[in-house]
Amino acid sequence: MDKLRIMSVFGTRPEAIKMCPLVKELASRPEIESLCCVTAQHRQMLDSVLEVFDIKPDWDLDIMTPRQTLSTITSKCLTGMDEAIDSLKPDMILVHGDTSTTFAGALAAFYHQVKVGHVEAGLRTYDKYSPFPEEMNRKLVSSIADLYFCPTVNNKNNLLKENITEGLFVTGNTVIDALKTTVRENYRFSTEELNRLPYGEKKIILVTCHRRENYGEPMKNIMLALRQIAEQNREVELVYPVHLSPVVREAVDKYLRGAPRVHLIDPLPADEMHNLMARCYMVMTDSGGLQEEAPALGKPVLVMRRETERPEAVEAGTVKLCGVVQDDIVTMAERLIRDKAAYEKMAHAVNPYGDGAACRRIADDILWYFGRREQPAEDLA
């Protein structure tokens, strides 16, 4: 019997962190030929992740251009995917999450009548402009997909409410699998400034901020809040790997650069980021992935957004929404800095995103779907 040709498609750093462990798990199965197609929606940041996981793509669309728009990303992905699908002839295409690459990859698969598996399916805010464009991307992919790999039961229930009743699996989140590869106790950073940080002596706060819906006034508020936190709390050090987006960098330069106890560094490879997270005191972010990663490492997360598509993290107590108003951000951050009981409650809450076996479950479910296994994997409880 011929091997199943399963092609994983991704283009951004967060997608790569979550998909690389799955690419490797699929490659370990004798029934599967694991193929990898990258769009390079984020070229430099993507390549650093591929290097960490030692993955060499079978196809590289290399679409990134300076100040690219959502329309150009999507159209280039669609055109490039035509050639990739014709050449590699996959039996199924796996897309992840909610990026423009995700949407274009699923749509291209549909045009070629190739089955689609959606990894990290079922996340919703029910506001099509927040996060933008991610909420609409994932809803559109849900209309196309054949298999839905949901991180949590809550995600599965979201899809059931939309009358999607077949091909639903609860797997946990593949990012927990990634952490098992990257986090090491005696890790030494290649970024020397990180080796010199006073871990244990001061409270290291890891910061990220990059989302499109935060461009403009919200980002200004966030930067001013971070500055205020650093100025008012001598016991903290803020470490901010600054996204390559020109919009983000302009805001950082205007409102945050030069503040005391703030370390502005370039984006970090996945292993550096995960090991910094493992050593920090807490995380402040507008990222989706960090809401899943940090709790697995026992780190409280403040989310600098108006809403989150990860309500199970809020319900579990690992994450708190602090919004995008300067005073609110400062108040919630300073509570965790100064109130040990509040900090410990978040740090010891149970992470709802699984046990690090999501990739195994997904591979088993795919084999079952194609009749190469008698039973699907047992869903994550």
Question: Where are these predicted regions, by residue range?
Answer:
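Nucleotide-activated sugar donor-binding and catalytic core shared by glycosyltransferases
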Residues: 1-240, 245-381
